[in-house]
Amino acid sequence: MLKNQIISVIGLGRMGLGIYNRLYNKNFNIYGYDINPDIKINNSHIKFLELEKIFELSHLILLVVPSNEEIYSVIKKYKIKMNSVLLDLTTSMPDQTIKINNYLSKKNVEYFDAAMSGGATGAKSGTLTLMVGAKESQLTQFKMVLDLISQNTFFYGKVGSGHAMKLLHNSVCHGIFLMMCEIGQLAEELDINLDDLIETFNVSNARSFISEQRFP
């Protein structure tokens, strides 16, 4: 049974801590690690393990670090439990994802990318959207975990496709943000109040996550 298996979260910042707490509150056998010692001081409920032990003992490892460049440097350093699963929740380059997968597959370790959208609020409330580079059947045993941390989970079939989807997602978000900046400047040049602009957009077809959450 999955709840009897050791699950670990590497990276306990705002996103990772939210994910850890979701699983901790449902009584999973969960451990954590973060390079920042203050995380341990300020979160006494977290069961900490050093990286060597996490890789040695864990059945499932959730990686919530800045990018998979950090992951590649770490996995070459430690021996990883055979038949364990690494779920990469970072926003990363797909070619690096494929490189990591090729390395780990030779060691009988499964690795999948599962990029996140929803921010720290989504991690805390379990309402993330996950973009997964795998077939759904490959992660059936972890459905309970995925359902606890995400409201929407999409499977794209092959390793790297989850991270590719996140890059497309971010490109749209950043593009809309830049356009909103330009439109805001143009509105001010036309003597239109920025607050009025955003209020109008948010109740019309021009509304977006960016206009609702990032402006003014």
Question: For each predicted feature, which ranges?
Answer:
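Helical "substrate-binding/catalytic lid" subdomain
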Residues: S161-P216
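Rossmann-fold dinucleotide-binding core
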Residues: T91-S171
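Rossmann-like NAD(P)-binding element
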Residues: L51-I80, V85-D95
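NAD(P)+-binding Rossmann beta1-loop-alpha1 motif at the extreme N-terminus of oxidoreductases
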Residues: M1-E56, L60, N83, A120-A123
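Hydrophobic beta-strand scaffold residues
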Residues: I30, F48, E110-F112, T153, ...
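Residues in the short beta-alpha loop(s) of Rossmann-like NAD(P)-binding domains
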Residues: I35-N36, S67, K135
